[in-house]
């Protein structure tokens, strides 16, 4: 497992420690982490502060995103996939998509390379959270 997905997992665990949903993200440029984020919907009472959005906000204005790669512990949803496409991010690496299939086809149809690592650690993190917080998870995915 590479350092970048490990950093995203660390962000997910930080979110869980804060009482939130354990999804983390990092943005990579020139083989360096330039931003980190995690889902803060619960912490900030903000329905759009998903991990990927938090990460992009933390990156600030970097100009061109075409040379970046976004890592997320879970396949990005349509909200986050829209941001990926809007900013021209060319590659997304997801820890898993079993828990939530996300918007892979949408991103790929817009020229984004999508890699699903199918990591047990990411699946377990989500599975344990959902078992303990089904209502919160259903709220997060719009059910």
PLM segments and residue spans:
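Short, basic/aromatic recognition patches
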Residues: 1-18
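Secretory/periplasmic and organellar redox-cofactor proteins
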Residues: 9, 124-143
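Short secondary-structure junction motifs
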Residues: 18-22, 65-67
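Short beta-strand scaffold segments in enzyme catalytic cores
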Residues: 23-31
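Zn2+-dependent cytidine deaminase-like catalytic core
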Residues: 35-128
């Amino acid at each position: 497992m590479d350092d970048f997905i490990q950093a995203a997992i660390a962000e997910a665990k930080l979110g869980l420690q804060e009482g939130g949903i354990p999804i983390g993200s990092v943005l990579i440029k020139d083989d360096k982490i330039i931003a980190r984020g995690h889902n803060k919907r619960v912490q900030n009472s903000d329905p759009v502060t998903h991990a990927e959005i938090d990460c992009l906000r933390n990156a600030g204005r970097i100009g061109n995103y075409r040379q970046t790669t976004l890592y997320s512990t879970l396949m990005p949803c349509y909200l986050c996939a829209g941001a990926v496409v809007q900013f021209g991010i060319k590659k997304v690496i997801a820890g898993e998509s079993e828990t939530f299939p996300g918007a892979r086809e949408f991103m790929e149809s817009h020229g984004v390379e999508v890699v699903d690592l199918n990591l047990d650690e990411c699946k377990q993190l989500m599975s344990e959270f959902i078992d303990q917080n089904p209502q919160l998870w259903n709220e997060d995915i719009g059910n």
